[in-house]
């Protein structure tokens, strides 16, 4: 067994995530809820993303996903099923940090997107099929595609 870390071995995906988050693919009919965070991508471009955030101590991943959806978008949702996990590296303070985000398929229950968090510039509904190609991050596009396949087998 090698003692190399995933980074040293050339892997793009971490073996043991040091940072864990949870998020939701919130659907209403054939529409999905997406956000444009105030924080821009590294190249300065706007980001189109799924709502997600850190799992607080003592919180379950599902609890975190529902809370983050509520905080970032202003809507309440209910669980349909789990969609899987996305793993990636990002940079914080010049260091590469491995991260894991578990995503859930959620159904819209109530709420107003105008009540979104101040860290979010915009919340909007868009066609789920369109989100599969237009979300900024590849892992989130894959998760949206899984949601579409789950809803329309």
Question: Over which residues does each language-model region extend?
Answer:
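Short, charged/polar surface micro-motifs in flexible loops or helix N-caps
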Residues: 27-32, 40-42, 56-57, 85-87, ...
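Short aromatic/basic micro-patch
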Residues: 49, 98, 125
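N-terminal strand-loop-strand
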Residues: 2-50
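Active-site segment of metal-dependent pyrophosphate-handling enzymes
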Residues: 74-111
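NUDIX/MutT-family hydrolases
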Residues: 110, 114-145
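The catalytic Nudix box helix
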Residues: 50-83
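Conserved hydrophobic/aromatic beta-strand scaffold that supports enzyme active sites
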Residues: 25, 34, 103-105, 125
